[in-house]
Amino acid sequence: MKPQSLEANIINPITPLEVTQELSDNVILTALDDLYDWVKMSSLYPFMFGTACCFMEFMGAYASRFDMERFGMIPRATPRQADLLITAGTITMKYAPALVRLYEQMPEPKYVMAMGACTITGGMFSADSPSAVRGVDKLIPVDVYIPGCPPRAEAVLDAITKLRKKIANESLQERDTTQQTHRYYSIPHKMKVVPPAVTGQYLQSHEVA
């Protein structure tokens, strides 16, 4: 190989690459599942569904101190371009059809992250409220839970790391068989009517006593 002159190095400081005959130096060999999982976990596009104070902590995770965009997470304004749904805050019965509709509009594969006690269990608003949904997993399947009231930004980053590990270990064939499909609510089927859990009997017994 002819050495380059000083003038050529100044104009083009990058020397041309040498092409070898070794296959490992020129071609990357990997499985299709590994390539697919690497692409998915490196480009998660979240869609935020925030209804309460937990969502404010999630906004802090996008600040310069944590910078969640370094994971390839670019927020999207429409569910049709997102593959990660993040719910934060209380989900009410009126919100349930809209939330399920947004989830159904997301393309496969899609993931759901429940953030905060109100989303996971209904929180303090579900104790005596017949309109609060006691857990978003009764409406849509959830992949990662972030407990807290509200959870800190460090917990959000830890959840993102766990979700990336889950995606990295997925298989295309296993996902079709293990994906949760049964839900209490869906677009073609109505919400199942169940007897109310809070009937006020404990209040009546307390007054009698």
Curated annotation (Swiss-Prot):
Major location category of this protein: membrane
SUPFAM superfamilies cross-referenced by the UniProt entry: HydA/Nqo6-like
InterPro entries: NADH_UbQ_OxRdtase-like_20kDa, NADH_UQ_OxRdtase_20Kd_su
PROSITE patterns named in the record: COMPLEX1_20K (PS01150)
Sequence positions that bind [4Fe-4S] cluster: 53-54, 118, 149
GO MF, one annotated term: 4 iron, 4 sulfur cluster binding
Sequence intervals crossing the membrane: none
Keyword Transport: yes
Membrane topology (UniProt): Peripheral membrane protein
Compartmental location: Cellular thylakoid membrane
Record's keyword terms, sorted: 4Fe-4S, Iron, Iron-sulfur, Membrane, Metal-binding, NAD, NADP, Plasmid, Plastoquinone, Quinone, Thylakoid, Translocase, Transport
Pfam families documented for this protein: Oxidored_q6 (PF01058)
GO biological process terms, semicolon-separated: aerobic respiration; electron transport coupled proton transport; photosynthesis, light reaction
Co-factor: note: Binds 1 [4Fe-4S] cluster.
Reactions it catalyzes: a plastoquinone + NADH + (n+1) H(+)(in) = a plastoquinol + NAD(+) + n H(+)(out); a plastoquinone + NADPH + (n+1) H(+)(in) = a plastoquinol + NADP(+) + n H(+)(out)
UniProt EC number: 7.1.1.-
A single cellular component GO annotation: respiratory chain complex I
Cofactors demanded by this protein: [4Fe-4S] cluster
Assembly mode: NDH-1 can be composed of about 15 different subunits; different subcomplexes with different compositions have been identified which probably have different functions.
PANTHER family: NADH DEHYDROGENASE, NADH DEHYDROGENASE [UBIQUINONE] IRON-SULFUR PROTEIN 7, MITOCHONDRIAL
Function statement: NDH-1 shuttles electrons from an unknown electron donor, via FMN and iron-sulfur (Fe-S) centers, to quinones in the respiratory and/or the photosynthetic chain. The immediate electron acceptor for the enzyme in this species is believed to be plastoquinone. Couples the redox reaction to proton translocation, and thus conserves the redox energy in a proton gradient. Cyanobacterial NDH-1 also plays a role in inorganic carbon-concentration.
NCBIfam families: nuoB_fam, PRK06411.1
Family: Belongs to the complex I 20 kDa subunit family.
Protein's UniProt name: NAD(P)H-quinone oxidoreductase subunit K 2
